């Protein structure tokens, strides 16, 4: 194999390694963002369930008073 071909191969391998490293970093960032978004969703779900519970309490309270003559 000529030196020129070897140099080209070496450059392509180096480019591939750099690309893989960048993709690994990007994947890690996306995993972190995914975790953050899941936590945010869980918080919204918890708050929404709290509000729905309050509405249910109001509805249950109204149901009792409307049935009483």
UniProtKB/Swiss-Prot annotation:
Per its UniProt record, what Pfam families does this chain match?
A: ZapB
Q: State its location(s).
A: Cytoplasm
**In this entry, which stretches build a coiled coil?**
3-60
* Record-annotated membrane-spanning stretches: none
Q: A biological process (GO) annotation for this entry?
A: FtsZ-dependent cytokinesis
Question: Does the record bear Aminoacyl-tRNA synthetase in its keywords?
Answer: no
Record flagged with keyword Acetylation: no
Keywords, A to Z, come to:
Cell cycle, Cell division, Coiled coil, Cytoplasm, Septation
Which HAMAP family does this UniProt record tie to the protein? ZapB
User: What does the function comment of this entry state?
Assistant: Non-essential, abundant cell division factor that is required for proper Z-ring formation. It is recruited early to the divisome by direct interaction with FtsZ, stimulating Z-ring assembly and thereby promoting cell division earlier in the cell cycle. Its recruitment to the Z-ring requires functional FtsA or ZipA.
Kindly state the subunit structure of this protein.
Homodimer. The ends of the coiled-coil dimer bind to each other, forming polymers. Interacts with FtsZ.
Q: Which family does it belong to?
A: Belongs to the ZapB family.
Protein name per UniProt: Cell division protein ZapB
Q: Upper taxonomic classification of the species?
A: Bacteria, Pseudomonadati, Pseudomonadota, Gammaproteobacteria, Oceanospirillales
